[in-house]
A protein has these predicted regions:
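Histidine-dependent nucleotide/RNA phosphoesterase domain, centered on the 2H-phosphoesterase fold
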Residues: 2-255
């Protein structure tokens, strides 16, 4: 991502350089998110189990529609820009063909969620105690289910730059999220783990894209104004469940 400025997930003021159409244009800020697709990919490592705490976001018809529209626009822009084309040489002649796997590298995210922790590690004998303390802390601070609304879309990437994401930034409901993060942070500190970012960018990643050949990004241009207006018009989504995963072990806490 030589043209992109990659910054940590920070507070919303850091996103002011984003384009007016609601998504970072090429050369603008790209926010680091190294756990957008982690819940299903983590497992046991020597010395501990990888953990992640997040709030479950139920996929609505509106989110599915926006996700698919983003995929279509990304693929179309990549094709128009030549990202989805490759040169081949046959019988001494060079031809340009469309890469067969362009769509396979851009896909809708499953298991939509809002992260509340970084990835952390616990010993197996610590897991049950952690979950019990986490449940008490969260229930004392969450005050039941609540709704969140979306303000705009931003471009995110993992730290290695191998994957990019379209994330819907959360606007309404941010205060409730901050209270829950505060409770989770206290539990993390109790177990000697690093708390979440001090001013997190709460978001839901809806589309992921693998980097193309030669490190070319699949996501690099802004969404159109019409798409931005659709995002703003999305109904609020209900948050009613927190999950904590350690490898293939999943613990659910109803708010």
């Amino acid at each position: 991502m030589s043209k992109d400025k990659i910054t940590p997930l920070v507070d919303y003021s850091s996103s002011e350089t984003s384009s007016s159409d609601g998504w970072c244009d090429e050369g603008k800020e790209v926010f680091v998110d190294d756990f957008a697709d982690k819940p299903m990919d983590m497992g046991h490592v020597s010395g501990g189990w990888a953990g992640h705490v997040y709030l479950v976001v139920k996929e609505s018809a509106g989110l599915r529609r926006i996700s698919q529209a983003c995929i279509e626009e990304i693929c179309q822009r990549s094709d128009d820009a030549g990202t989805g084309k490759a040169e081949t040489v046959e019988c001494g002649q060079t031809s340009v063909i469309k890469e067969a796997d362009i769509r396979s590298r851009v896909r809708r995210m499953e298991g939509l969620h809002v992260s509340l922790t970084r990835v952390f590690y616990l010993q197996e004998h610590e897991i049950s105690g952690f979950v019990e303390i986490l449940e008490r802390a969260v229930l004392a601070s969450s005050h039941g289910a609540f709704a969140v609304g979306f303000s705009k879309a931003s471009m995110y990437a993992n730290e290695t730059g191998s994957r990019e994401f379209v994330g819907l930034d959360i606007g309404s409901g941010e205060e409730r999220l901050a209270k829950i993060v505060g409770a989770v942070d206290e539990v993390m500190r109790r177990f000697g783990k690093e708390p979440f970012f001090s001013n997190p960018r709460f978001h839901v990643s809806i589309v992921r894209a693998e980097r193309g050949k030669g490190g070319r990004g699949m996501i690099g241009k802004g969404l159109g104004q019409a798409m931005h207006e659709e995002i703003l018009a999305l109904p609020a989504v209900q948050i009613s469940q927190l999950e904590c995963v350690f490898g293939n072990r999943r613990f659910c806490i109803a708010l």
